[in-house]
Amino acid sequence: MAGIKLTHKLYQYYQLATSFLYAALLIRWLILMPLVGSRFLPGGIHEFLIYLMFYSSIMEVIWLLRFHGFKYGLLSRTFLKDLNFIYLVSVIHFYDDYEHALILKNASYSSFIISLSLSQAYCHWCKLFKRKGVKERTLVWKVNTFVTLPILYLSEFALLLLNIQVKNYHSTPTLDIINRVVLLAYFPVLLTAYKKLLTK
């Protein structure tokens, strides 16, 4: 019994901490953007963004499998989201030259950060509390679903498209093929997951 309570406490701490970290990402962007502009923005925020996306996704997958098992966990929208974030991190990390990556100076990078931080702060905050039955569709839910998420999806697609168009020395022929396949499958998979969100 004590072990179950500890597990639930740790789960709540994870959701709370992750929610605040994504809020901190937005605050960081709000501070940096007026000071340095899009040209120097990656130097002050990209490392934080990449680490946050990667580790929060890994932890969420662990919790997902812990509570729902492999069968239901791997077929969930949450797992698809986390897999997508991990893939995106692997594509745009630019670990050794992110200050100079042209892709990260594009407007889609800022819109991605804003929509990501808002949607994930809200998502993890909602998971702090158990809800039974049909969830109430509040104004915040509607804004997140019909405004924030579409901007996030379009911004990510733009970043992935730019990553193919703008060559860098991280690119390889195999990686280019994988990226093109992902782009082709992006909207069909996205629309399927989005439809499930609207009908749940």
UniProtKB/Swiss-Prot annotation:
Residues 1-15, 66-82, 167-173 are lumenal. It is a multi-pass membrane protein. Residues 37-44, 104-145, 195-200 are cytoplasmic. Keywords: Cell wall biogenesis/degradation, Endoplasmic reticulum, Membrane, Transmembrane, Transmembrane helix. One of its GO terms (biological process) is (1->6)-beta-D-glucan biosynthetic process. The chain crosses the membrane at residues 16-36, 45-65, 83-103, 146-166, 174-194. It is found in: Endoplasmic reticulum membrane. One of its GO terms (cellular component) is endoplasmic reticulum membrane. Interacts with KRE6. Involved in the biosynthesis of (1->6)-beta-D-glucan polymers of the cell wall. Required for viability. Involved in maintaining chromosome stability. This is Beta-1,6-glucan synthesis-associated protein KEG1. The gene is KEG1.
